[in-house]
Amino acid sequence: MADSKVTTASLQALLDAFNAHDVNAVMSFFTEDCVFDMPRGPAPGGRRLTGRQQVREGIQSRFDGIPDIEYADDRHWTCGDRGVSEWTIRGTQRTGEHVEVRGCDLFEFTDGKISRKDSFWKIIE
């Protein structure tokens, strides 16, 4: 992401990197001091990962936990230093349980890179 302007194409490229399960490519979109608020965790805001190393480990854990994870049915919006991606995750957890859930990511950008990613998932009951 050499350009500091964030576009929907930037968000699509990020999703493409997720779908390739390429943690290095995914991390190239993030700032050094990035924050990732995961959809699950011990607090109402989910589990917070801070800094590139924690975010990298969290993303790798997602790939490891759902080896065939795929983001599809996506739409993206940007406005200034903010962005939104809407998607459906599909895959199979290591337990054999199939996952299909609708969700979105809210993004904040600094100099064209993600400084904060806040993920939300629908709860299926």
Whereabouts are the PLM-identified features?
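A solvent-exposed, acidic/Ser-Thr-rich amphipathic alpha-helical stretch
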Residues: 2-4, 24-75, 79
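Short, aromatic-enriched amphipathic alpha-helices that serve as compact interaction elements
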Residues: 3-22, 29
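Residue-level signal for well-ordered, solvent-exposed loop/turn and beta-edge residues enriched
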Residues: 35, 97, 113-115
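Short solvent-exposed loop/turn micro-motifs enriched in small/polar/acidic residues
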Residues: 9, 68-70, 99-101
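Short beta-strand segments enriched in hydrophobic/aromatic residues
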Residues: 30, 89-91, 121
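A short hydrophobic beta-strand element
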Residues: 80-89
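Exposed beta-sheet edge and beta->alpha loop/turn motif
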Residues: 88-110
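Short beta-strand edge/turn micro-motifs at domain boundaries
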Residues: 102, 106-125
